[in-house]
Amino acid sequence: MMNNTSKKPFDFPPGTVIRGKWYKHIYTIVKELGYGANGIVYLVQGSSGYQALKMSDSNVSITSEVNVLKSFSKVQGAPLGPKLLDVDDWEYRGQKIHYYVMEYIQGTDLLSFVQSKGFSWAGVLIAQLLTDLERIHKEGWVFGDLKPENLIVTGPPYRIRCIDVGGTTINGRAIKEFTEFFDRGYWVGGSRRAEPSYDLFSVGMILINLAYPGRFTKSGNGNMQQLREAIGSKDQLKKFEGSILDALEGKFQSASDMRVSLLNGLSHSQPVQQPKPKPKVKRPVPTNSHVSSSPSHTSRYQNHRNKKSSHFLETVLVVMIVSLLYVLYIYGELM
């Protein structure tokens, strides 16, 4: 859910009871969900069931994330992030700990889901993500720290959800949080200015990560050439190659543009190989001295050819129907 390269800000065991200073709501820690530079998230049980509670010793960080969630909640359509439930302080042994409580989104992280269900789901889910990013960008925000750990797949019906808004930044400011593998500055030296193209670079790297679950380290200067070679070395990525490269090179004007490009790749992702007709074998033409032709023999031969032609047309028709059903299935998953 969050970066775990920094030191834990807190380490409370399961069973710890948190009582809000102002609103007096009580939460019991069930387990740790993840932590990062700006706080730690616990699964807690409150009066309304299981929820996620993020705490920090920085009131600025908590306030910033609360403002993001409040902003997201005002956007029409499918929720862009977890629903905000409570904001309060907790006094623990003379220390004031700031926290907020949000909806606990149950599901599987994106990487694990694709590994379990198959890479064919990657394009469908990333297209959903791009729809959400388009809405986020139109509200003046950039997600910033986009990576599979911050993306949960719920359902069925399967739907991708963002679960950690800690890196979300107002458009035009410096990115607050990032993870190197998905960072434009790390790979190509691009700026870490919060703008849609920064998120789209990360989306391209997420697709690469789905094909390389263990990721890989930067070699030498770690320029675009290394990324091109990585894309070209995986058959799963070839149908998305143009979309990924355009995202990495900053050629898309919006998340919507990348989504259109991605869907074009999906529509041609599984061409059905039609059976190749067998080469005709030339047979010696019988002469009158060997075999005398008869009307019944000619009729049977023509019927055989007609049957072969009929079978071929049936095969073509079946292939067309299967292709149409696949396209309808893909677009149905995107709705």
Task: Give the predicted meaning of each segment.
Residues 5-7, 26, 30-31, 37-67:
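ATP-binding glycine-rich loop module of kinase domains
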Residues 82-98:
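Short beta-strand micro-motifs within the conserved protein kinase catalytic domain, predominantly
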Residues 93-109:
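Conserved short submotifs of the Hanks-type protein kinase catalytic core
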Residues 136-154:
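Catalytic-loop of the protein kinase fold
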Residues 166-235, 241:
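C-lobe/activation-segment region of protein kinase-like
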Residues 249-273:
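Terminal C-lobe "cap" of eukaryotic-type protein kinase domains
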Residues 273-335:
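C-terminal single-pass membrane-anchor helix
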